[in-house]
A protein has these predicted regions:
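Carboxylate-rich, polar loop motifs that coordinate divalent cations or form catalytic acidic clusters
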Residues: 1-196
């Protein structure tokens, strides 16, 4: 990390027994000021007051939280972890972990690529098979589909990244460009920059 006051960098590694993994793929700062990190192979962990704490990597012996690709928080302070092949996990304020896998939710895949929860209630879930929305209050999940025609809603179903702006627009990065989707009743737009 970089200390602005001292103008120096500090290297933190697994070799120093400071963190559980050296392969960090995502980070998130929650409302309590904790810095969360997702890793390949050793799950999620967070830093608070200079100390790192690890989240359990197995749940009920059949769910693995080893490969965490994305992290976000809802308005209730629940932490959501998206994994590469094992779905979504919610850590509530009491430390309980709840899995949301394709077997339990009806999603087409357990490969979670990205999250956005800008309003604190609607968790937009990017996957290798489309974009879903979960209401974090009711836990209902729906696939965002194009109801106006037989065509797919998005140019590409593999969602790489999502950003929700202050207008409610979802900026969705895919392998074939960018889609802009609105959460209000306005048509979406597909944009391809410099491509075919």
């Amino acid at each position: 990390y970089y200390d602005r006051k001292k103008n120096n960098y500090t290297f933190i590694s697994k070799k120093q027994d400071a963190i559980p993994s050296d392969i960090i793929v995502c980070s998130y700062k929650d409302s309590k000021g904790r810095l969360w990190f997702g890793s390949y192979g050793n799950g999620a962990f967070y830093e608070q007051n200079g100390k790192f704490s690890k989240v359990a990597t197995t749940y009920e012996q059949k769910y693995s939280i080893d490969y965490v690709r994305c992290i976000t928080e809802d308005k209730y302070g629940n932490i959501w972890l998206g994994t590469i092949m094992n779905g979504i996990y919610c850590l509530d304020n009491t430390g309980n972990i709840t899995p949301y896998t394709m077997e339990k939710t009806g999603m087409l895949t357990n490969s979670i690529t990205t999250f956005s929860c800008a309003d604190g209630i609607n968790l937009y879930i990017g996957t290798s098979s489309g974009l879903y929305c979960m209401n974090t209050e009711t836990k209902e999940i729906s696939l965002l589909e194009n109801n106006n025609s037989a065509s797919n809603l998005f140019e590409e179903v593999h969602i790489n990244c999502i950003y929700q702006d202050t207008r409610g627009l979802l900026w969705i990065g895919t392998r074939k460009g960018m889609d802009v989707y609105t959460t209000v009743s306005v048509p979406y737009t597909t944009a391809v920059f410099g491509g075919e």
